[in-house]
C-alpha cells in the first residue's frame, strides 16, 4: 500500500490517465529511463504526482533553478499536504568561491552568507529520508555537491526516550559532539539551553523547540514547544536529535585525516620545491599548518570542505556522497524540464575543476581539494536506478536513453488547443505587430514578444510605449523576485505587452497571453532552435484564442520542424475535442505564485507597519522592543514557510539590529 495521500479537486482527464498508467507500469517493471513528453499546459506535474502516489517510493524531483524548484515544491505540497514534500537548494544567500587570478596576482578569499531557513529545510529533507517513506524532495542542481556521509550522520544521531535512564550532562556532551552549541540566553537552530532540570534544544531541521524534562537521571517528558509563545505543541515518547551539520567526523576518523593531510602536505611541498616554486611552497605550508592546528584544537577550520576527501576517508578521485546517497535503494528520480536540466548536470564539474587547479598550482590548496566537488555527469547517472524525464521538448540524450519508453501527453484537460502559427515577412513587421497588439488590448488579452538582442528589445519597448501601448521589458539584470512581480503585474493587467530576449525561463505560463510574437525567427541560433521555438510558441498554448506569429523572410529547418510539431499536436487536440464533444474552456488560474501570492502581498502591508515600528525603535521602551522582535520573528517564519527567503532574510537582519539596540540600552 502506498504511503502517499494524493489530494486534488479534480481527477485525471484527457490523456493523463493513459500517461499515468504507462509510466507506473514501466516503473514497476523496472524500466531505467522513461520520458514524459508533455505539451505545455497538459498538467505534467499532476501526472507525476499521480505516478509518485501510485508507485509509493521516495522521489527526488530535480529542477534547473531554485525558482522553478520553489514553484514545483508548492504545487506538490498542495497535492500531498499530509506527506513530507521537502525543498533542497543551495543555502547561500551570497557565495563568492575561493579563487586566484595569476595575471594580477589577486587572491580572492571565499565569502558566503548562509540562509538559515534554507539550511533548516535541507536538514529537514535528510532527516525525513531516514525516518519516512512518504518523502518527495524537490531540489536544484546543487544536490550533486558533497553532503557528508549518510551513515556517519545517522550514526551520530542522539536517541532520546521517555523513561530512559541517562544523565543530563551526558546528553549535553553528546549535543556538543554533534556540533550544537550551548546558549542559555537564547534558543535557536543548532543551539541548546538548560533551565534547572529542563533541556531545550533547537534542532537543525525544524523551527520548533524540543523540550526534554528530566527527573533525576531519567527522562520524564519530551515535548515540542512553540519557539515564540512557549505553547506545548506535541508530546512524544521518543525521538532522534540529528547533527547540526551534515558533515560529521568521528574523533578517530579526524585523527587519521590529520595524519593523511600532513603526509600529503609534505609530498606537495617536495613537488613545488622541485619545480622552483618556493613562494608557493611557503604559502601552502603556512596555510595548511594553520588549518591543521584548528582541526586538532576545535575539529573545524575555515575552508574545511577542502579536506573533505581525507575527513570522509575517500580514495583520490572517488565521487563525494551527496543528497542522493541519503535516499533508499528504490528511490525514483524525476527530471523536470530535462532539456535544460540534463545539460546543466554535465557542466557543473568542469567549471569547478578549472578554478581548483589554479589554486593548487599556486600553493593555495593541496591537490586533494579538487575532490571537494560536484558529481561528474557519469557519476550521477551511475547512482540513478530509475528516472522519468519530463519536458515538452526533451533532448536527444533523454530520447536515446528512454528508447521505446516515451509517453506522450498532448491533450489539455481544459480542451484548449495549441496556438495557430503564422509566418509573416519582416518588412513592416513592427506596424503589423502593433496592429495585432491593439486587437489583444481591446479584448483584454496579453502579448509576449521575443527579440534576438537586448538593444532591439529596448528600442521596440520605446516605440510601442510612444504609441500608447502599456509595455514592459524583461531583461537579465532583473532578479527573481522583481521578475515574478513583473509577471504578476502582466497577469493583473497593469500592462499588456511583455518584451524580452529569453522568454523561455520559468514562470511564464500565463493563461492571459493570447499572442506570442517571435522576431527574426529565421536567424538560426540558441534561441531559434526547433526546441526553443516550440517552447516559445507554447507560451500562447493556455489561451483559447492563442496565436503565434513568426516574423521571417525564409523558412529554416528549425522553423519547419517547430511549426510541423505544433500543427501535429493541434490536429490531435482538435480531433479529441470533436470526438468527445469538448468545448475549450479558458484556464482560470488564481493570480498567485509560489514566491509571490495574494497572502504574501497582504503580509507586506503588515510589513510596512512593522517597518515604521523598527524605524522608531529608539523611542520604544525596553518592554516594547521584545514584543516587536516577537512579531518580526513570526513574520520571518511565515516568510520562510512560504519559501520567501529573501524577505525572511530582511526580517532576520531587522531582528538582529533590534537585539543590538536592546543590548546597548541595557
Swiss-Prot record:
GO terms (BP aspect): nucleotide-excision repair; SOS response
Domain UVR: 626-661
GO cellular component, one term: cytoplasm
Signal peptide positions on this chain: none
Domain Helicase C-terminal: from-to ranges: 429-595
Domain Helicase ATP-binding, residue spans: 25-176
UniProt subunit comment: Forms a heterotetramer with UvrA during the search for lesions. Interacts with UvrC in an incision complex.
Record's protein name: UvrABC system protein B
